[in-house]
């Protein structure tokens, strides 16, 4: 448990630290996670974990996976102080093999077909990363006095729903998530059932007290047959610690079948009836006193009505002036042309858009460590299948010219590391100008780090309010978005960046 808590603390620090140096020093925590290793194409890393699982069982789930360790934390809460609700503990349940392996097939099939959303939502590392970057990081920024920013309310909602669901399931059913919908846990279970080291119950010593089964978060200890289902066991050693007789041991000796036969357990069902409650009738409203009437039968104005009438009369000229101003603004706005055809811009460092979409897990590590806060989890800009992949919000900020932070921390190879010189020429988009919106202020010219924008005389066939108009040199533009961010034209900006490499 101590190793798991240390790994949980390191993973949490990786996503929430405000120090760039510390984030880069801790990037190895993300690089040893199984799903990022698979997407990065690290055959050696995957084989190493499979070999460790074949020897020791699912130690990854109890010592390395941050989401698994977080479930252990939630599962331990009812046991603190020996609360009455945990008096009966856990009970053995049959494995849900049909469901979990069918679900594993669906997730793998979606990933192969290019539908990354299933893996993005259910990969334990990515789900934990969103919890940290969307929930814990804003809280930590507020504590440290830094500007607090929720990158995406959609991602925040998904992270909050994931946290609540995982906490509730772990509170009541331990590691049920790991042994049903987690694709990593289901994959490792195919190997761990044949693990060399396993938990064995010595029937000559066991007194059938059932303590080991009551503390087993995986609900995999069958006391009727005195066997432990190695495909679900996460090697947490809680059963060994609680057995006072020393009857259960972690050993290479095998006194049972590789895949033990499980006895069906009929869960007890209880029906709770709640008495119906009758709503009490609402009290009758007290009658309002009638207004005093003048002798002629005309109602008298009280003080409130008098002042309200006076305010309406006094405000009438101001309302009319505001209406005329609104019409003038609408007339000017009608001449504005929206920037059409702009495609989403993805972070620098990708080999191609297809490679980026295939390898990105939507963990949010690049979003959490972007110093410009320009990265956002997508909400459909890249398609529903690629939701939560990072995109640039160039109206909120822009990509810093010398920054390579996102490429340094990406664990899957979706973004390859770039040097500062490589970043200076890496094209993520191209800027374009809508002449009807340009006011000729020249701010984009002064902000462009590449000198790709200049002011030129407006042609006769180009409508607009100014004599000069911004012009973009496409050969020099890299799509950093500084021009779009600084453009003061309202309500529609005069310059915008469209992402490149959108070949299907």
Regions found by a protein language model. Give the residues of each.
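Non-ligating segments of multi-cofactor redox enzymes
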Residues: 1-226, 231-232, 238-504
């Amino acid at each position: 448990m101590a190793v798991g808590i240390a790994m949980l603390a390191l993973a949490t620090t990786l996503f929430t630290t405000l120090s760039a140096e510390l984030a880069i020093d801790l990037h190895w925590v993300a690089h040893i996670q199984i799903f990022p290793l698979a997407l990065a194409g690290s055959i050696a890393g995957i084989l190493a974990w499979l070999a460790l699982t074949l020897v020791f069982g699912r130690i990854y789930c109890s010592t390395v996976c941050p989401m698994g360790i977080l479930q252990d934390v939630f599962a331990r809460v009812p046991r603190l102080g020996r609360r009455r609700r945990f008096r009966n503990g856990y009970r053995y349940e049959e494995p849900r093999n049909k469901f979990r392996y069918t679900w594993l097939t669906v997730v793998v099939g979606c990933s192969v077909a290019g539908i990354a959303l299933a893996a993005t939502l259910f990969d334990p590392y990515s789900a934990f990363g969103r919890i940290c970057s969307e929930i814990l990081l804003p809280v930590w920024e507020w504590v440290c006095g830094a500007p607090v920013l929720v990158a995406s309310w959609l991602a925040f909602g998904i992270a909050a729903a994931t946290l609540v669901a995982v906490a509730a399931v772990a509170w009541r059913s331990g590691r049920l998530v790991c042994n049903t919908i987690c694709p990593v846990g289901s994959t490792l279970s195919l190997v761990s059932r044949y693990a060399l080291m396993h938990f064995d119950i010595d029937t000559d010593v066991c007194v059938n007290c059932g303590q080991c089964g009551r503390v087993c978060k995986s609900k995999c200890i069958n006391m009727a047959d005195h066997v432990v289902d190695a495909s679900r066991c996460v090697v947490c050693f809680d059963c060994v610690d609680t057995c006072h007789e020393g009857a259960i041991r972690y050993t290479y000796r095998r006194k049972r079948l590789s895949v033990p036969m499980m006895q069906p357990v009929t869960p007890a069902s209880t029906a709770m009836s709640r008495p119906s409650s009758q709503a009490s009738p609402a009290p009758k409203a007290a009658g309002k006193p009638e207004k005093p009437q003048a002798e002629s039968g005309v109602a008298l104005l009280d003080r409130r009505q008098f002042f309200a009438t006076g305010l309406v009369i006094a405000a009438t000229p101001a309302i009319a002036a505001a209406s005329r101003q609104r019409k003038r603004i609408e007339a000017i706005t009608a001449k504005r042309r929206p920037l059409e055809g702009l495609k989403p811009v993805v972070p620098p460092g990708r080999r191609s858009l297809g490679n980026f979409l295939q390898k990105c897990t939507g963990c949010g590590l690049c979003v959490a460590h972007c110093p410009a806060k320009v990265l956002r989890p997508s909400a459909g800009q890249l398609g529903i299948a690629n939701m939560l992949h990072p995109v640039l919000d160039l109206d909120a900020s822009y990509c810093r010219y010398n920054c390579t932070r996102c490429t340094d921390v990406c664990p899957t190879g979706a973004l390859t590391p770039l040097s500062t010189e490589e970043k200076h020429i890496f094209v993520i988009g191209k800027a374009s100008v809508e002449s009807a919106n340009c006011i000729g202020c020249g701010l984009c010219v002064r902000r462009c780090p590449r000198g790709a924008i200049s002011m030129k005389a407006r042609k006769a066939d180009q409508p607009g309010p100014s004599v000069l108009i911004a012009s973009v040199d496409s050969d020099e533009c890299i799509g950093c978005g500084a021009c779009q961010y600084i453009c003061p034209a309202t309500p529609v900006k005069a310059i915008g960046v469209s992402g490149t490499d959108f070949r299907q």
